């Protein structure tokens, strides 16, 4: 498996933490922009459907081939839009559920080492004698112990075996630690 060096500055790391915290806060807000988006797109879909009914009615009453063809094309476009909106909303709701559930699931538990994720990002940090290791959307980010952020190894984790292989390859023995990576 090929590892890629990724420039990862302290500013970038803190920005990621701030964005993550801001997104979690937004998910807890009942008037979140995502929910507004769902409401607006649903209303828009209803309006489009009403317009379709009007065009179709005019075509039938006037027996106009042009109106019937236009309503057919318009109907196809509405169906495509509805399918895309439905898929998008399902994804949004799933992400919101994952982000706000507060439940954690174990990714790896072996030899006293436990890696856990909450939604798509971890709130747990892992300690090794030289590195902070954080899993962020199934990428391992290695950060220097003294809080001076250096280039990190970024490895997409698609399977559990990839994660085990990464830890074994780099001789990383981790002790499970709760809390933030800063100020330890």
Residue positions per predicted region:
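Generic detection of short hydrophobic beta-strand segments and adjacent strand-loop junctions
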Residues: 1-6, 124-125, 153-157
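Conserved beta-hairpin
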Residues: 82-124
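A structural detector for beta-sheet-dominated domains
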Residues: 107-109, 116-118, 136, 156, ...
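A membrane-cytosol interface segment of integral membrane proteins
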Residues: 139-184
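Phosphoinositide-dependent membrane-docking surfaces
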Residues: 113-114, 123-139
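N-terminal membrane-targeting/pre-transmembrane regions
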Residues: 1-51, 55
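Alpha-helical transmembrane spans
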Residues: 34-100
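Mature, Sec-exported extracytoplasmic domains of Gram-positive
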Residues: 23-26, 113-118, 122, 157-160
């Amino acid at each position: 498996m090929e590892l890629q060096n990724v420039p990862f500055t302290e500013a970038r790391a803190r920005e990621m933490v701030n964005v993550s915290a801001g997104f979690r806060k937004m998910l807890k807000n009942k008037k979140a922009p995502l929910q507004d988006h769902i409401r607006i797109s649903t209303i828009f879909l209803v309006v489009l459907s009403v317009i379709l009914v009007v065009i179709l009615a005019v075509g039938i009453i006037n027996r106009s081939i042009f109106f019937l063809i236009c309503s057919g094309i318009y109907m196809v476009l509405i169906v495509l839009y509805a399918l895309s909106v439905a898929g998008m909303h399902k994804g949004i709701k799933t992400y919101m559920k994952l982000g706000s559930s507060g439940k954690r699931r174990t990714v790896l538990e072996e030899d006293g080492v436990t890696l856990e994720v909450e939604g798509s990002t971890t709130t747990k940090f892992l300690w090794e004698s030289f590195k902070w290791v954080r899993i962020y959307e199934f990428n391992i980010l290695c950060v220097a112990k003294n809080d001076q952020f250096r280039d990190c190894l970024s490895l997409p984790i698609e399977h559990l075996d990839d994660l085990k292989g990464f830890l074994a390859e780099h001789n990383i023995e981790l002790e499970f630690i709760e809390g933030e990576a800063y100020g330890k």
